Amino acid sequence: MTCDTVVISDIHLGSPVCNREKVLKVLSLDFKRLIINGDLFDNYSFKRFNKKDWDILSKLRKLSKTHNIIFIHGNHDSNGEFMSAIMGMEFVEYYEFELNNSKFFLEHGDKYDHWIKHKPFITWFFTGIYYWLQRIDKSHRISRLTKKLSKSWIQAKDIVRTKFVEKRGKKYDVLMAGHTHHAEIVDCGACVYVNSGSFCEVKCSYIKIYEHGNFELIFM
């Protein structure tokens, strides 16, 4: 099957837990279009970048000359419009397209997260703790357990999915989000909800969409 589109999200370049090798591996795949569904950057402190981070940006810049690259605004992408212009990518709030009569709608998902809207400081604080645990806990056992026990994280991923489907599900066949770092495919009746996961977890994940409109969630 010919791959039409690859969807990745939540790379968080500059973060100590970004799996850069796997990002580069995905960017080397054969596809026609690349959609970055938010949070390409962790923040814009380039002092935190290492050689692999710059290699990824260089690869994206090179791909933009021959491929259609869509960069969807995520909550970490405060200067995304400026960076997109430099790198030759299209910067948007959301993206929609149709393949073989299937209508796709992509949005990062942070707009449906009540923690981001109403308690941003708490969100940033606990995200920092989680990343710190991933750095010191090389087996990732503590960080995975912390995530599983976090009621706010469990609620956030469910709330994002529910609100996204409520708003867009009647008009589109497939909804795709990122933000929660929880990769999943859920049949919601009127539509299918897919979350591409992230490149900051033990298992990284991304989405392949084929020319006939079928798709798969791939773990690496």
Language model regions located:
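Hydrophobic anchor at the start of a short beta-strand
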Residues: 5, 69, 215
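Structural motif
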Residues: 4-5, 33, 102-104, 174, ...
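Core catalytic region of metal-dependent phosphoesterases/phosphodiesterases
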Residues: 8, 13-100
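Conserved catalytic scaffold of divalent metal-dependent phosphoesterases
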Residues: 66, 70-171
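Active-site environment of divalent metal-dependent phosphoester hydrolases
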Residues: 13-16, 41-44, 73-82, 111-115, ...
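Flexible, charged surface loops at secondary-structure boundaries
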Residues: 1-2, 27-30, 64-65, 98, ...
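Binuclear metal-dependent phosphoesterase catalytic core
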Residues: 97-100, 187-220
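Active-site-proximal beta-strand elements of phosphoester/diester hydrolases
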Residues: 4-12, 103-110, 192-197
